[in-house]
Structure formats: C-alpha cells, structure tokens
C-alpha cells in the first residue's frame, strides 16, 4: 500500500528548489560576517534569500530577522512583554502570553490589539482568524504560502514564519518587523541580523528558506491552493453524505 503524507502542517517535504539552493550553498566556504571574498560570497547567499522572502511575504528586506525557528522568533518578540492571547495558540506563543481572551465561534475576541498575539491559522483545526486592523504580534507560520497574504498589509507590528512549513528545511525561521518597530536581542555576542540576533547565520538553511518562499509564492499565484481547497470541499461533502455521524472542526 502506498502511503500518503498528510501532515504538512507539522512539516512539509523539502521542495526541489530548496534542495538545489541548499546544495549550492554548501560550497560557500566563508562566514557571512567576514569581509574577504569568501565571506562576501556567503553574505550574498543570505541576502539573496532575504530578498526572496521579502518579495514572497511582502515585508521589507531590512525588517527580516533570521532565527533558528518560528519558536525562537516568537520568544524574541513576546518574552516579558505582557501580551494576551486566546487559548488556541501554538505552544511557542502560549509560553509567553496570558491566555485570557475569549473565543466566539472559533474567533478570538481581541480587545487590546497592540498587546495581543494572534495566530493567522491553526495547525490542527485549520481555522483562519480574521485579523484586526492593527495587531501586536501575528503567528503567520501556517498561512504563508497557502493564503493570499502580505505582512505589509496585515496590520501586524511583528510576525513570525518558519521554512519547513512551506517546503524549506527544518531549523530556520524568521521574525518580521513593521518599519519603526524593534525588538531587544536575546542572543548576544555579535552584530548579526542588524544587531537583533547574534550568531553566525545558517547560510545553507537560509538559502533553502528563500528558495522555498519563492516557490510557495508561485504556487499560490498559479492557483495550486485553490485546487486543494476544492478537493478538501469534495472530501468533506463525501464524508457528510456517507451517513456517518461527523463533526467537522475547522
């Protein structure tokens, strides 16, 4: 029997474009912080990926902070900042917020947008939240590459994303900042990522992230996810017509 992998919200298969970009980056010898030619070559790979993510996610290139995961990005944005949320958030966000916001028909009731953390889409139920006009933090990990979305018009001050949710490698994510919004670095000891996150960048992983982001944006514009939505609807209707007692969640 042929197995079909359906757990893409947990992690998605590596895209061929990401694999090719990562293989190419493996030959980059230098440290992207070094000023010699090898270092500049590695830096160019990082900045190419930053540009790809900037275009795919609708965020300024200088407002992207590369991290090791969306979990780290969430901590960088939320730790000790007194944010509130509903009780539906991923553990990476729930660890840093007060989960005291009520829900109404699956939607979080936002009362103080500037101090609210809100996920765009739930990894288990698939429920998509209606984002308010302004928002302190948005976990966009499950939305990028699947929903028509740009950080620039989302209304969020800060958002996070992860490479392996859209066909990139595990172990790399990013934080996105609205122009003028800053975060206090938690990893110190270097000036990488414009002083926001110290440590030598994961050049290979970032290369894969950029390529995956570009490919996912093409899939979205080509209508791939509209087709998947139709298939999902057919599946739901078929299950409902089976006569079995079903509860569709999401």
Predicted regions and their residues:
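Pyridoxal 5′-phosphate
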Residues: 1-250
